[in-house]
Amino acid sequence: MDKIVFLEPVFCERIWGGRNLESFNFDIPEGNIGEAWVVAAHDNGSSKIVNGELAGLTLKEAYSENPQLFTEKKYDKYPLLIKILDASDNLSVQVHPEDDYARVNENGELGKTECWYVLDAKEDSKLIYGHTAKTKEEFDAAIDNEEWDKLFVEEGVQKGDFFYIPAGTLHAIGEGILIYEVQQNSDTTYRVYDYDRVDKDGNKRELHIKKTKDVTKVPFKKVATTREVENKEGATITYLADERYFAVYKLDVSGKVTLEKNKTGNLFTVLEGSGVVRVGGDSFDVKKGDSFILTIACDTFELEGSMFLIGSYDK
C-alpha cells in the first residue's frame, strides 16, 4: 500500500492568467494559464498519480476505488482541491455558495470555503475581501445600481499574507498576486462584476446576479486568523488555519526534521527550495512545484533540505 503519492497538476487557461506558473518548474501549455490544480479530484479536472502502485490513475479514480487510503472519514467525493493561481489581471468579483445551496442548485456540488496564502504580490497589490452593506436590501440595491466602488472592500496585500474565505464571502484576487489556495472540492463560482471585459471571442463572461444575492452573507464579518508557531530542530511550523473543512500549516525546513502525519491524509506542495522526503525507508527528491499526498498508510515522515512547503488536511 502506497504511503506517498506524487501528483501531476492540471492547468487551466483563464482570461486573467499569465505565465508565472512556469516559475514552479511546470511545463505549462500555451496561453494565459491562470490555475494549476496541484491536488485535484474533480469532474472538471483531476491530478494524475505518477508513482507507485497507483501510477497512471487520476486522483479521482484512485479515491473512488480506495477512499480509505486517502481520508479517515468517508466522503462521497475527495474533500479538498488545491490550486496555485497566477492573477496577472484582476479576477472577477465573486462569491461561492455553502454546501446546502450548492447541493440543491448545482447538481449535488459541494459548497466552497477556501483560504489563500500569498506567495508573491507586486507593490501596491490589492484584493477585494467583503462588502460594506449592512442589510440585504442595501446589498441588493448596490448591485442593481452598480455602485461597485461603494460596495466592495479593498485590502492591501503582500507576500506572506493569509486569508480565510468562508462560503458566502464576496471576494476577488487582484492583479499581480500569486496565491496558494486550499478549498473544498468545488468548482462553483458566482460572478457579480467582471470589469466589463470580453474574452478572445469578444464575449463578456456570464454574471450570476440572483445567485450572488442569494448566497452572500450580509453584513460582512471578517474572520480573523491567528498564527501559532512551533519551532523544531530543522524546521519551523506555522499553523495558519484550523477550520470546519480543513487545517493548513506552513513548513520552513532548514535541515532535517521528523514529523508525525495527521491521522487523515496530508497534502503538501513545495513552494520554494528543494530537499528530500523520506517515508517508510524510501527517499524521494522534491523541488519547487512538487505536490504529494501522505496516505493513511503513513505514520511518520522525514523532511530534509532547504525548502518551504504548505501542508493541509481535511477535517
Map each language-model feature to its residues:
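Ligand-binding loop in jelly-roll beta-barrel domains
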Residues: 77, 85-90, 121-124, 169-189, ...
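An exposed, glycine/acidic-rich loop-and-rim segment of catalytic or binding clefts
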Residues: 145-151, 162-164, 170-221
